[in-house]
Amino acid sequence: MIVVPQERIQDFKARGWWGDTTLDDLFLKHVRERPDDEACVDPVNAAAIVGGVGDRLTWRETSIAVDRMAAVLHAHGIGKDDVVVIQLPNIIELGIAYLALIRLGAIISPAPVQYREHELGYIIEKTGAVAAITADRIGKHQHGGMLMAVKTRAPTLRHVFVLGETCPAGAIDLEPLLDAVDGKQHRAAQKASKSARITADDIVTICWTSGTEAQPKGVPRSHNEWIIMGEGVVDAADLTPGMRLLNPFPMVNMAGISTSFVSWLLLGATLVQHQPFDLPVFLQQIRDEKIDYTVARPAILNLLLQNEALLEGIDFGRLKSIGSGSAPLSEWMVRTFHEKYGVQIVNYFGSNEGASFPSAWQDVPSPSDRAVFFPRLGEGRKWKAKLHDRIFTRLVDPETEQEITEGGKPGELRVKGATVFSGYWQAPDINARAFDADGWFRTGDLFELAGDELQFIRFVGRLKDVIIRGGMNISSEEIEGHLAGHPAVAEAAVVGAPDPNLGERLAAFVVFKPDQTASLEEINRFLTKDKQIAVYKQIERLETIAALPRNPVGKVLKRELRDQLGSGVSA
């Protein structure tokens, strides 16, 4: 399925920004050229996460596993343009499932492991997904049984495939089927893949992002749209073939897929997986797996330098660079990692929709600049960054719609170019608001022009009413809608409370009905049990308030609520 307009495809290919190579082409190239090199490594704690024994595979062994998975999925009717929801942690089987579905021309819809029945039911309904792949348990939660419960209310969902030591009734136990694949099944899958005529412009994924709308929005991306994002990562971090990459970010969105999965395929690297985040295990993997590149949140990098005992015995001899972002970086952290350990920090600003601004040492050598500034791409200045002429930016006054050309004045960042998607999945009304009249995508993020020559942009805030907790976008409107259904709640407003580790945590200001109240525990029990929302969307701070502050037209003044949190004044 191709959703990118043909004129865009032709334009980007004529400029040499897009090509005809698919992600499967990249994979098969490495299978041919480096069959016995190590390709992928399970997390140290894989057994605790999903059961079984952690594994490590060569490119040849990975190829055999992909062939078997493709054969089983094809035998159950999965083919071109079918949407398959995948809910798996960062284990080897996740990459294998991705590659098998890519081989068949199916569309992958990755779901965070934190999603529960509410979110899963929505994305299955929205995409018309025909199948789901999960593990019987992920950690302590029974995901196989959960998806079987969703299946009873999802008429399009034909199959739930399950990995693990047990399998719930009615689901399909993948492991014995994978072991029993025969030549006939293998040849049938090969024939189906060939006849599907998969192109680099076909959709690979529909990832999910939360904005101001109550429900998550699907972001479709093609092979070409993923490859150019991966190329930006490889270029910014100066990665080379054969490197060893450590991935602690869930492979469900831009951060996890472009920095790990796609970069791995571009480089023929070794992909070492990590999840859930565990600092001692993370450091152990850097040491034992001889890692060349990884990514981490700013708070983690600050913590390491503030507690050097954590770094005892860790050899940074091979670690060349670390990617970070999603929150402001510390100049001290960027400088210290380089001067003391020889590790360069790359500051990334990006989004599922395709905003991509790497601030790397090649273009921004000053640690103080790199911590807060991003190259102003697409305005004629030549940068070393490969994306410098492939993405275009402008800042616009959100009130007047006039372009901002002077420094120090905040404006909404708008982008277009070869990295930017063409629109949300089956959401024409939202798309009409998401792009302006000239085709620029409205990011909802506020930046200002900076630098002596206005050569940089600096993030200053968000227009969107979104809370970013540990890299996960959470729609405050969604949570407010759920809170409105609580029998004791008259009205509620949800904002982000600053947090040094996660960036933000959820804080709810609640007006209770007369003579009624509820505790934080009761509110969260209602959200997780009655509304079945993901655990990471729970309220972490509850403030009781007599009335929500509003402007003259009735809009809730969330800035005042955030100010109350910052001042420590209870409402």
Could you tell me what each predicted segment is?
Residues M1-L57, E61-H76, T166-P168, A192-K194, ...:
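N-lobe entry segment of adenylate-forming
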Residues V162-L163, Q532-V556, A571:
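AMP-binding/adenylate-forming catalytic domain of the ANL superfamily
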Residues I227-R244, V252-Y293, N307-E308:
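Conserved AMP-binding/adenylation subdomain of ANL enzymes
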Residues R287, I322, L329, V334-F456, ...:
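Conserved AMP-binding/adenylate-forming
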Residues W17-G19, A39-I91, G95-L99, R116-G121, ...:
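Conserved AMP-binding/adenylate-forming core of the ANL superfamily
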Residues H76, A106-A180, P298, P514-Q516:
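Structural core segment of the AMP-binding/adenylate-forming
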Residues P35-E38, V162, C167-P168, I172-E175, ...:
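Conserved pre-ATP/AMP-binding loop-to-beta segment of ANL
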